[in-house]
């Protein structure tokens, strides 16, 4: 039972027999909580259960939770590979009680597992308790029979857990394993506790209080249990290892890396092998859970992890992308426990391969500069932070890679000067923006925003309203009037016109008043929330304080609403068909079309597109109500609203819900699609009419785009397609239904004619028909006692040239055959064949190279009995053949 997979199974089965529900690991991207970078503990998926927001039928659970700690306060990245127990990715084994059992049973379960199931000797175990937790102290004595000296009271916060400033909290009890007195270090609570002799293997959290305010706690009516045991740590103990990287799982990965790179697992590159093994796990699992490398948020953390591993791959001598070639080894070791790894294997490989291919250029350039700038430094010196910033800012070389590259030489980086350079660059960027060509205009808008405040938007409820002109702007300057025929901008006290944002185009329409009319051609948002209406005065003269009737183009707005709602449905349908990794990267919501950009590594098949379209249209046909409501941001997250990590949200957000769903989240029923969105939408899904996907393409590496039509534009497109089909069917003298069969028959007929034509060309190439052609004598001449068949032909492909040369060799019996084909664009291709009895005298490769030179080409390749080449000048085909004859005769 000492293997990692066996230990994991034994843990889960042990608690399963005790009435615990074995719950699958939650994703590394926490559901409905964009404030948390990654899942970093087993209790994360049960947070709402512990706080009482969510109810569970089973009050006991056990998990093996995949975790990542590589961002924010939980950042182990710099230490990974250089210590025995630091990891970016790890598995947290845990058992949980939600108001069911408490300390006594938790301690009993833990002690029996590690001593009876795992067989750890009692004399090598000790525990800690919170200094004030007399109950836990007494229970350890009673259940485990431990002496007082093996139950250590810890007065610090290390043994008291809190979820936050308020909420559930309670004392902890940690179980430690003694690796032996041959390893430096003292027990917890001693001055030598930071040594490696005593290692924590399990933490039991006793949630028994509700913290109202700092220092003010009330007992919870139903105390709970949350425990966490690092799988890698307990595996090391059970396998008799002091170092996590020596366990079977890591050793299997390290062997795979060593086989590819030739590195010695115990040699000077030991740390690099460990870095790659750890980072391969973190990168692969993050990609499987939908995170892709980018320059922000979770994607940036992933990119840092990947690039650090790639840097160490180069240290091992890898000259080609390495990590993607190791995914199979990880899937072999962990795929059974985590099926999502198996499903995502192709995407993981492709993502790693593309990222490493791109990064190698950055890495090579950065390392050259780094070597130049640090060549005079010696161990203990400090590398200039300004130069480190230049590497980062100009060459895209991350700071942590600079630190990592210098670490082996004992050189540190001046972080203070790096930070100063970063701050100066940001200040310079702000100043540069202030001096841009839009300065005057932007200054006007910020001034008006400060003077007038935010524009009140009425467009969610109405498309017609009354407003008063608050300001007029022309050519970037505030003006007192706009005359008929003049173009300018109007700012109002309130407006039903939607301003372009979130991918949705701005509204158009008209504004009318006493003797005046203004045509709105565009609506923009300036200075964050100032609505600016651009257009032309069609009648009269506009002045501030003019009262106007504001009318949005209803037909256009209706089409835009349909397209925006359709993007939400397509987003969810894409997730259902392609996977949960789908995340929006951009969109366009216009009157006549929509496009939606999203994270995905490969083209979408026609079948997948049809499934996406069908799923979205099913929701359209259900004609469900579309609800939009303002909610507190925390409530919106609890309701399952999709929120992009890195987006900044205010205290109140707008939640758009579409379609029915049987899923429940606490007391909130989720819709089929639930997103945070500030755009305008249809009232019922049926108002969309029809969704028709018209195209799919790549936008950037790892980003795909679908384009679609809705409503009347989709109908018009469908009608046009029907008209085209009818016209085509008429031209083919068949019906639309029979057109595929008719086209297939025509294609078969065409292929047959093409084959017949190719055969005719081959016969011509070999000298036409007749007996001479049949025995291979047509066009044959003797050169230096050797039969030579040399012909220039047209309209024959290179593959057919090869078959003709093979045929000619058989017919000649003994000789050399050379055929040159000239293509439509004037290029020449040549194939030379030599019969077996002559290859000792003539090499087809040598002969074809001489011909290639005449055609303007270089080289040529093949075998002594068959070779091919080409050149740009097919007009010299005969000269090329003469060169071969000369070589044979010479």
Curated annotation (Swiss-Prot):
Give the E.C. number(s): 6.1.1.7
EC class (word): ligase
Q: Which cofactor does it need?
A: Zn(2+)
State the InterPro entries in the record.
aa-tRNA-synth_II/BPL/LPL, Ala-tRNA-lgiase_IIc, Ala-tRNA-ligase_IIc_anticod-bd, Ala-tRNA-synth_IIc_core, Ala-tRNA-synth_IIc_N, Ala-tRNA_ligase, Ala_tRNA_ligase_euk/bac, DHHA1_dom
Localization of this protein: Cytoplasm
Q: Pfam families, from UniProt?
A: DHHA1, tRNA-synt_2c, tRNA_SAD
| Major place of residence | cytoplasm
Q: Key word RNA-binding present in the record?
A: yes
Residues the record lists as binding Zn(2+): 564, 568, 677, 681
Q: How is the cofactor bound?
A: Binds 1 zinc ion per subunit.
Q: Which domain of life is it from?
A: Bacteria
> Where does it sit, as one GO cellular component term?
cytosol
Does DNA-binding show up as a keyword for this record? no
Q: Which reaction does it catalyse?
A: tRNA(Ala) + L-alanine + ATP = L-alanyl-tRNA(Ala) + AMP + diphosphate
Recall the GO molecular function terms of this protein's record. alanine-tRNA ligase activity; aminoacyl-tRNA deacylase activity; ATP binding; tRNA binding; zinc ion binding
Q: Which family does it belong to?
A: Belongs to the class-II aminoacyl-tRNA synthetase family.
UniProt free text on domains = Consists of three domains; the N-terminal catalytic domain, the editing domain and the C-terminal C-Ala domain. The editing domain removes incorrectly charged amino acids, while the C-Ala domain, along with tRNA(Ala), serves as a bridge to cooperatively bring together the editing and aminoacylation centers thus stimulating deacylation of misacylated tRNAs.
Report the protein name in the record: Alanine--tRNA ligase
């Amino acid at each position: 039972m000492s293997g990692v997979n066996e230990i994991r199974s034994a843990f889960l089965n042990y608690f399963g027999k005790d009435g615990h529900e074995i719950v699958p690991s939650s994703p590394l991207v926490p559901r409905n909580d964009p404030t948390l970078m990654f899942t970093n503990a087993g209790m994360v998926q049960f947070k709402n259960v512990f706080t009482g927001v969510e109810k569970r039928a089973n009050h006991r659970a056990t998990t093996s939770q995949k975790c990542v700690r590589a961002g924010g306060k939980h950042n182990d990245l710099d230490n990974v590979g250089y210590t025995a127990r630091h990891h970016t990715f790890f598995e947290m084994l845990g058992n949980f009680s939600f108001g069911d059992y408490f300390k006594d049973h938790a301690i009993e379960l833990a002690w029996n597992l590690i001593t009876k199931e795992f067989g750890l000797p009692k004399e090598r175990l000790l525990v800690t308790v919170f200094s004030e937790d007399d109950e836990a102290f007494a229970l350890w004595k009673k259940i485990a029979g431990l002496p007082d000296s093996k139950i250590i009271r810890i007065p610090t916060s290390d043994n008291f857990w809190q979820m936050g400033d308020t909420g559930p909290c309670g004392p902890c009890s940690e179980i430690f394993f003694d690796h032996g007195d041959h390893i430096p270090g003292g027990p917890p609570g001693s001055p030598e506790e930071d040594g490696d002799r005593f290692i924590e293997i399990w933490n039991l959290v006793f949630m028994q209080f509700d913290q109202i305010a700092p220092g003010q706690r009330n007992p919870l009516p139903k105390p709970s249990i949350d425990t966490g045991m690092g799988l890698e740590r307990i595996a090391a103990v059970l396998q008799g290892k002091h170092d996590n990287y020596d366990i079977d799982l890591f050793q299997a990965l390290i062997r795979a890396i060593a086989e590819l790179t030739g590195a010695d697992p115990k040699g000077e590159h030991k740390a690099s092998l460990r870095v790659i093994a750890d980072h391969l796990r973190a990168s692969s699992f993050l990609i499987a859970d939908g995170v892709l490398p980018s320059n922000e948020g979770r994607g940036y953390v992933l990119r840092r992890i990947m690039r650090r591993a790639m840097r160490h791959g180069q240290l091992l001598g890898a000259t080609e992308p390495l990590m993607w070639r190791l995914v199979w080894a990880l899937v072999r070791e962990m795929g059974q426990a985590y099926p999502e790894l198996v499903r995502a294997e192709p995407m993981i490989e492709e993502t790693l391969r593309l990222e490493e291919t791109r990064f190698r250029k950055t890495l090579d350039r950065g390392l050259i500069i780094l070597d130049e700038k640090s060549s005079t430094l010696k161990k203990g010196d400090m590398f200039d932070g300004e130069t480190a910033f230049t590497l980062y800012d100009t060459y895209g070389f991350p700071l942590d890679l600079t630190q990592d590259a210098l670490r082996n030489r004992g050189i540190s980086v001046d972080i203070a000067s790096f930070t100063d350079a970063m701050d100066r660059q940001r200040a310079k960027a702000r100043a540069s923006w202030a001096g841009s060509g839009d300065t005057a205009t932007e200054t006007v808008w910020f001034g008006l925003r400060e003077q007038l405040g935010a524009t009140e938007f009425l467009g969610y409820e109405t498309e017609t309203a009354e407003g008063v002109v608050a300001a007029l702007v022309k050519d970037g300057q505030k003006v007192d009037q706009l005359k008929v025929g003049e173009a300018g901008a109007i700012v109002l006290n309130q407006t039903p016109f939607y301003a372009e944002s979130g991918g949705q185009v701005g509204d158009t329409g008209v504004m009318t008043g006493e003797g005046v009319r203004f045509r709105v051609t565009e609506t923009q948002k300036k200075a964050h929330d100032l609505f600016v209406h651009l257009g032309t005065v069609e009648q009269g003269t506009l002045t501030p304080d003019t009262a106007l009737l504001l009318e949005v183009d209803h037909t256009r707005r209706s089409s835009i609403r349909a397209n925006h709602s359709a993007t939400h449905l397509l987003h969810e349908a894409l997730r259902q068909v392609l996977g949960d990794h789908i995340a929006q990267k951009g969109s366009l919501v216009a009157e006549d079309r929509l496009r939606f950009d999203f994270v995905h590594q490969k083209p979408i098949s026609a079948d997948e597109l049809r499934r996406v379209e069908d799923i979205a249209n099913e929701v359209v046909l259900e004609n469900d109500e579309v609800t939009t409501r303002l909610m507190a941001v925390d409530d919106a997250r609890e309701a399952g609203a999709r929120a992009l990590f890195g987006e900044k949200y205010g205290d109140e957000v707008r939640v758009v819900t579409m379609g029915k769903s049987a899923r429940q989240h606490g007391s909130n029923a989720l819709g089929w699609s639930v997103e945070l969105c500030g755009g305008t939408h249809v009232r019922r899904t049926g108002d969309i009419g029809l969704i028709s996907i018209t195209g799919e393409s790549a936008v950037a590496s790892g980003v795909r785009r679908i384009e679609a039509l809705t409503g009347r534009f989709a109908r018009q497109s469908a009608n046009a397609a029907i008209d085209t089909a009818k016209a085509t069917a008429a031209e083919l003298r068949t019906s639309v239904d029979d057109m595929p069969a008719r086209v297939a028959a025509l294609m078969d007929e065409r292929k047959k004619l093409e084959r017949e034509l190719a055969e005719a060309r081959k016969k011509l190439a070999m000298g036409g028909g007749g007996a001479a052609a049949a025995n291979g004598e047509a066009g044959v001449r003797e050169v230096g006692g050797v039969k030579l068949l040399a012909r220039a032909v047209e309209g024959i492909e290179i593959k057919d040239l090869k078959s003709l040369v093979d045929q000619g060799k058989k017919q000649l019996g003994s000789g050399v055959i050379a055929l040159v084909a000239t293509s439509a664009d004037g290029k020449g291709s040549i194939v030379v064949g030599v019969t077996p009895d002559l290859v000792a005298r003539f090499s087809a490769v040598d002969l074809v190279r001489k011909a290639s030179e005449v055609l303007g080409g270089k080289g040529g390749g093949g075998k002594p009995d068959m070779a091919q080449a080409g050149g740009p000048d097919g007009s010299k085909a005969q000269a090329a053949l003469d060169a071969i004859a000369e070589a044979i005769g010479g």
